[in-house]
Amino acid sequence: MNVCLRFRILLFFAVFSSALFAQNRQKSPVAEMRGAWIATVGNIDWPSKPGLSPDQQKMEFDSILDVLKAMNMNAVFVQIRPAGDAMYKSPIVPWSKYLTGKQGLAPADSLYDPMEYMIKAAHTRRMEFHAWLNPYRASFDLDTASLAPTNPLRSLPNNRKSEWFYRYGNRYYFNPASALVRQYLINVVKDIVIRYDIDGIHFDDYYYPYKETGQNLDDYNAFARDPRHFTNIEDWRRDNINLLIQDVSQTIKKLKPYVRFGVGPFGVYRNKDQDQNNGSDTRAGIVCYDDLYADILLWLKNGWIDYVAPQIYWSVGFPPADYEKLVDWWGKHTYGRHLYIGHAAYKIGNSTIDPNWNSPEEIKRQIAVDRANPNVQGSIFFSARPLLRNPLGVQDTLINVLYKSQTVVPGLSFMTKVAPLTPQICGVKGSKSAVKLAWNICNILSGEEMPYYYAIYRFEGESVGDFKDPSRLIYLSPYHDEKLIFEDQTTIEGQYYTYVVTGFNRVNVESYSSDPVFVKKTKNGAKKKRKFWGYLF
């Protein structure tokens, strides 16, 4: 009888043993989002300047990832649509000037697709790649002559431009009220999801523009022409954004259900003096709902987004917008979706307004607040470049204190109906320097899926220990792993060890655990002692 078949037959014994191991079957604490935004607009993070060769761009991106990986980060959110343009090879959107120096100008190497390279580079390091789009920003200035001829801001006839675009301040924006614009943006997202192996689509905080003194939105005629059922223009504006968010969500789920859709909004939804029921105890001058017309809570309630990553760019105790109060508020309004907190890495050691940011303890306080809230699944830092500069030794703080152990991205169980197939350890081989483990997958049953990657937990002694101890996670395999072999080179002669393997799917939901394997490290190798059948993780 092979190991997989025997595992299936003996699964019912797990019910009997489940109480014994109940504490070990809880959600692993090694699950935590640890991400960084990589901004391309204005060449904030990457590439360092326009016009670099493809090899130079690759080298710079690899360098960023290597530093982030050393800090045990597990995801990057890369801005691939900074201002109506593309940091990738698109049949719809012109090449970005931040890449080549001129909008519409392709890289010198015709085979080079920056996003394709970045995805592979991230996945090779076992980091998720989320494609970050600014949906509505059409230009970063008023110089339309410098735009690519294929840019609709140039190519459309003047009588249609007024439907597609509006000017606000010194920039042009896509008009959220236009059904044609909405379909255009959906097509952009659809193209990315179909052609690229991304883990998520990410929108930032820009919907309607941040308000400027003396500026008014010029959309009253559009509202008069097509108010739909609205009598209030502000409700109408919010609904314009709602329609895009809903349509993008549905488009993604139809194409690739595992691709996550999330947003990184401004950190305050509404102040309490604006909304006693849904407002936070803050005095923010700008808020999502009333100024940017982004009804984040509606998107969460309706399940249109899979996570929210509010930009809480203030310190713990900052009077107008206290970090701790805002984390608590967002934690009470997740509606079953994931919550990742956006941290202002750019303020670390660099604030003339709030002295808290000039203390190396501030980021420790913020992460402590996050981890004390059961509804917070992790953090995203804005942005990568400040982390690389290491202000106040933040890299060292992350590596040696806060992010000392590796983690997986928390599983989004609401995005899948089944767990991935359960792996089983099928071979143990020892040498003087290592214990080698091999595992395989049981017979595939209807509706089950192969793991996307694997984790190995190791416990000292001859029993399964605490899965909540992050030091027990000793190995995470590459994505799309087919090798199914691991060498543990940190064993000690004469010591007994217990190994367990689990698998994860594309939304990081973990499988049942394998049966534990008990091994004694000997002078010349390792000796497998016995198995406990039917243990469920």
PLM regions: where:
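Aromatic- and acidic-residue-enriched segments that line the glycan-binding/catalytic groove
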Residues: 86-101, 137-168, 205-228, 274-284
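Pro/Thr/Ser/Gly-rich low-complexity, intrinsically disordered linker/stalk tracts
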Residues: 393-449, 493, 508-537
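Catalytic domains of carbohydrate-active enzymes, especially glycoside hydrolases
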Residues: 59-85, 196, 298
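Active-site-adjacent "subsite" loops/lids of carbohydrate-active enzymes
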Residues: 31, 39, 43-59, 131, ...
